[in-house]
Amino acid sequence: MTDNSATANGPAGAPPLHGAIDVHAHFFTARLRAAMQDAGVTRPDGMPAIPDWDPKSALRHMDEVGIETAMLSVSSPGIDFGTPDAVRELARNVNDEGAELVRTHPGRFGLMASLPLPDLPASLAEAERALDDLGADGIALHTHYQGHYLGDPLYEPLMELLDDRRAVVFLHPTSPQCWKDTSLGYPRPMIEFPFDTTRAVAHLILSGTLRRHPGISFVIPHAGAALPVLADRIAVFALMQADGPPVDVLADLATLHFDLAGFTLPRALPALLNLTDTRHLLYGSDFPFTPDWAVEGLARPLVDALDPAVRTDLLHGNARRLFPRLREPRSA
């Protein structure tokens, strides 16, 4: 896997990412930021602040590190602020503005649309609008909505729609409802996010949701969170489900795609490669929650650790196969 030469990824000082497609990139609209502030969410999930974001700064950052395309999504805590009508309108706002960014900057941005869950009828309508009218590249879903995880039968109509559309779904963690009892005062992205991702994916598998809907391509963040370590444990316990659907946990995990946002070396990536193969790996920055200097600092050792063919697949080859609109590189 490794190529540790000093010039493994080009000359010294060159952007480390060489045309990467970033599947884990976030954005804010003015309306979303105002809704968060009005709701008192100024330190989302215990982070220090709502990070700054604007298209010009994002593009400058992308050019500096070598990202060709950023697939934009709304991070935790999402858009569930205010009345159901307000949430529906906020979903339309972030999706409309995201689609406009894609149109205004061809090849530089993609859109993973937000849905006003847990309002299922409105979410079905917004998913159709985003995919059909706005040309969204996929849908961003959080691990749960008001405590209902994605394997819940509540979401079956949505999963059917996404399966029929062969949609790409980017899964993003959010704080579990019990976070006040479990986070121990630490920022929730440190411990709660990885375990909520693990919980959500396990539920998708153990409920049979993943197997019932093979047309959905799920992207799991942060190198699979705790799944590479817990996969065998979950698989054995699954055999004890007397009343659950028959599942093959390891086979189902092998169908997923995994982004490498965050701290993947030296331990997480080797563990993940015991669970899946390199053609299921995707690059993710988690910008702007991961600031620009940290994106570059994490990217350089990652790309230098990979053989050239694996590096190409990770940075853009696998993403081009996953997202139809991106199958051809952007014209210079």
Please place each PLM-identified region on the residue numbering.
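Short, basic, glycine/proline-bearing loop/turn elements
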Residues: 40-47, 143-144, 250-257
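Active-site gating/metal-coordination segments in enzymes
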Residues: 68, 74-201
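H/E-rich (His + Asp/Glu) clusters that bind or coordinate divalent metals
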Residues: 6, 179, 186-205, 217-332
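Hydrophobic faces of well-ordered beta-strands that scaffold small-molecule active sites
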Residues: 21-25, 70-72, 110-113, 139-141, ...
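Short, conserved clusters of charged catalytic residues that mark active-site
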Residues: 53-57, 153, 157, 201-204, ...
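Acidic-and-aromatic substrate-binding clefts and catalytic sites of carbohydrate-active enzymes
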Residues: 48-53, 79-80, 117-123, 146-153, ...
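Mid-to-C-terminal alpha-helical segments outside catalytic/metal-binding sites
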Residues: 2-23, 29-69, 96-104, 125-129, ...
